[in-house]
Amino acid sequence: MKRKIIVACGGAVATSTMAAEEIKELCQNHNIPVELIQCRVNEIETYMDGVHLICTTAKVDRSFGDIPLVHGMPFISGIGIEALQNKILTILQG
């Protein structure tokens, strides 16, 4: 089953692209079919239907119902990337 993931940042360009590429590679390496949607943080609600995970590189102080939310800055900084990858895999494989 294809997993639908929203990757959001402030402008839907630079940091969300980096995070999306990391997530795409992670999923390919673990044979997880994925559909990635890049958007701005303020557009997340537009794309939430059927989503399995939301990853933001900007600070978000709210929840999105039952959809898990992870902070994607480790994909940008490189600090804590393995822990984030493990968390994403746990969510998507669960």
From Swiss-Prot:
<keyword id="KW-0762">Sugar transport</keyword>
<keyword id="KW-0963">Cytoplasm</keyword>
<comment type="function">
    <text>The phosphoenolpyruvate-dependent sugar phosphotransferase system (PTS), a major carbohydrate active transport system, catalyzes the phosphorylation of incoming sugar substrates concomitant with their translocation across the cell membrane. The enzyme II complex composed of GatA, GatB and GatC is involved in galactitol transport. It can also use D-glucitol.</text>
</comment>
<keyword id="KW-0298">Galactitol metabolism</keyword>
<comment type="subunit">
    <text>Forms a complex with one each of subunit of GatA, GatB and 2 subunits of GatC.</text>
</comment>
<dbReference type="GO" id="GO:0005829">
    <property type="term" value="C:cytosol"/>
</dbReference>
<keyword id="KW-0598">Phosphotransferase system</keyword>
<dbReference type="GO" id="GO:0019402">
    <property type="term" value="P:galactitol metabolic process"/>
</dbReference>
<feature type="active site" description="Phosphocysteine intermediate; for EIIB activity">
    <location>
        <position position="9"/>
    </location>
</feature>
<feature type="domain" description="PTS EIIB type-2">
    <location>
        <begin position="1"/>
        <end position="94"/>
    </location>
</feature>
<dbReference type="GO" id="GO:0009401">
    <property type="term" value="P:phosphoenolpyruvate-dependent sugar phosphotransferase system"/>
</dbReference>
<dbReference type="GO" id="GO:0090584">
    <property type="term" value="F:protein-phosphocysteine-galactitol-phosphotransferase system transporter activity"/>
</dbReference>
<dbReference type="GO" id="GO:1902495">
    <property type="term" value="C:transmembrane transporter complex"/>
</dbReference>
<protein>
    <recommendedName>
        <fullName>PTS system galactitol-specific EIIB component</fullName>
        <ecNumber>2.7.1.200</ecNumber>
    </recommendedName>
</protein>
<keyword id="KW-0597">Phosphoprotein</keyword>
<feature type="modified residue" description="Phosphocysteine; by EIIA">
    <location>
        <position position="9"/>
    </location>
</feature>
<keyword id="KW-0808">Transferase</keyword>
<dbReference type="GO" id="GO:0015796">
    <property type="term" value="P:galactitol transmembrane transport"/>
</dbReference>
<dbReference type="GO" id="GO:0008982">
    <property type="term" value="F:protein-N(PI)-phosphohistidine-sugar phosphotransferase activity"/>
</dbReference>
<dbReference type="InterPro" id="IPR003501">
    <property type="entry name" value="PTS_EIIB_2/3"/>
</dbReference>
<dbReference type="InterPro" id="IPR036095">
    <property type="entry name" value="PTS_EIIB-like_sf"/>
</dbReference>
<keyword id="KW-0813">Transport</keyword>
<dbReference type="Pfam" id="PF02302">
    <property type="entry name" value="PTS_IIB"/>
</dbReference>
<dbReference type="InterPro" id="IPR013011">
    <property type="entry name" value="PTS_EIIB_2"/>
</dbReference>
